[in-house]
């Protein structure tokens, strides 16, 4: 009898134990606490068009299982005699349940449940580069491939909403939409001036610059008031003030040199920059030295505090949704606190996977998307510091 009462007490205590929000299994009365599935989607070829770093398709890894290979989603087939198109960008819409891939010739969307292509567009044939989604997941801002214009696109259908000319920013290349969804930051490979568009009117509202060199990868703070930009011929970064439109800081990496002869990709020493979610750190690539440098962003100018060796030349960085990891284009997974490499991406054949086009997606136990991250490593502090 005592054993029965003890067992009954245990059952009652378990029933009263709270389950973390969002982790409760749905349907059939199940009450098990389940961890959301945390998957990293990596589009290849994402180091130019070299299929030696992961082949062709979208390679998926499980972050909860030390980034073990899960599957490969087919994208395009190419005859052996034709070089594949290098992937230029990747993004995920939570409400539409779609993943988007851009190449040097097209933009396409796949349903993440069926893994089937939903639509594909080439627009005027001058498509495409690294795009961005508005926070509501409904509109894509897509750079043309090197032209002085961006496409504003309906994310559900691929329909062109507007072809926006950017006379101050040529060589359309990289795009970020602010966390509040009001601004699209437009950087061109052939320009020292960045344009900013008002997403409510789809018109250019201001410019920032002149930067010291043509603007390469960049990121912004969560308030959308500061731009952290790589530029040509600088092992480091510059900071642009959105309010004044001026460049306010130039930060160079100390203790490391570079030369063009030591660069095999992109032609600039730093091609990749990301803010930590709390905006206390800036992480910067150094392709010439196969290194990632970390800066303290709580002081101005930011101070270099740590350097981490990569297995190859890094050309892109972004953060995990939980702030635990930094993803390098080399396929190195970096523990953001310990600042050490804790895993390396390999595909189903054991081949190294390297790509500048990766995005993390978290799924509820029922398979619906819970959250995703932007490929640009945007700061997540929404209010500007006093």
Predicted regions and their residues:
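Positively charged n-region of N-terminal signal peptides that target proteins for export
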Residues: 1-6
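Bacterial N-terminal signal peptides
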Residues: 7-18
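Predominantly soluble domains enriched in secretory-pathway, periplasmic, or organellar proteins
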Residues: 14, 26-386
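Signal peptide processing junction and immediate N-terminal pro/mature segment
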Residues: 19-26
């Amino acid at each position: 009898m005592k054993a029965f009462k003890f067992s009954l007490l245990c059952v009652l205590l378990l029933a009263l134990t709270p389950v973390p929000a969002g982790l409760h299994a749905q349907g059939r009365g199940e009450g098990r606490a389940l961890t959301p599935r945390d998957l990293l989607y990596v589009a290849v070829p994402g180091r130019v068009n070299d299929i030696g770093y992961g082949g062709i398709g979208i390679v998926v890894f499980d972050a909860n299982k030390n980034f073990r290979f899960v599957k490969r989603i087919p994208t395009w087939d190419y005859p052996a005699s034709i070089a594949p198109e290098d992937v230029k960008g990747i993004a995920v819409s939570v409400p539409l349940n779609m993943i988007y891939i851009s190449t040097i010739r097209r933009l396409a969307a796949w349903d993440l449940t069926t893994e089937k292509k939903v639509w594909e567009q080439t627009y005027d044939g001058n498509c495409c580069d690294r795009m961005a989604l508005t926070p509501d997941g409904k509109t894509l801002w897509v750079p043309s491939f090197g032209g002085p214009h961006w496409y504003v696109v309906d994310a559900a259908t691929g329909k062109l909403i507007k072809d926006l000319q950017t006379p101050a920013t040529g060589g359309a290349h990289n795009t970020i939409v602010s966390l509040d969804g009001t601004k699209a930051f437009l950087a061109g490979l052939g320009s020292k001036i960045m344009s900013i568009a008002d997403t409510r009117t789809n018109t250019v509202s201001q410019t920032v610059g002149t930067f010291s060199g043509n603007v390469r990868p960049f990121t912004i703070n969560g308030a959308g008031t500061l731009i952290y930009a790589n530029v040509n011929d600088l092992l480091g970064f510059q900071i642009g003030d959105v309010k004044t439109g001026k460049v306010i800081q130039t930060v160079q990496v100390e203790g490391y040199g570079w030369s063009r002869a030591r660069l095999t990709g992109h032609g600039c020493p730093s091609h990749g920059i990301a803010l930590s979610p709390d905006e206390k750190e800036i992480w910067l690539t150094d392709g010439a030295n196969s290194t990632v440098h970390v800066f303290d962003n709580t002081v101005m100018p930011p101070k270099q505090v740590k350097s981490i060796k990569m297995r190859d030349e890094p050309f892109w960085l972004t953060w995990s949704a939980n702030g635990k990891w930094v993803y390098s284009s080399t396929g190195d997974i970096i523990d953001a606190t310990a600042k050490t490499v804790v895993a390396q991406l390999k595909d189903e054949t054991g081949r190294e996977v390297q790509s500048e086009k990766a995005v993390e997606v978290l799924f509820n136990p029922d398979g619906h998307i819970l959250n995703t991250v932007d490929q640009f490593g945007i700061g997540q502090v929404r209010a500007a510091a006093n």
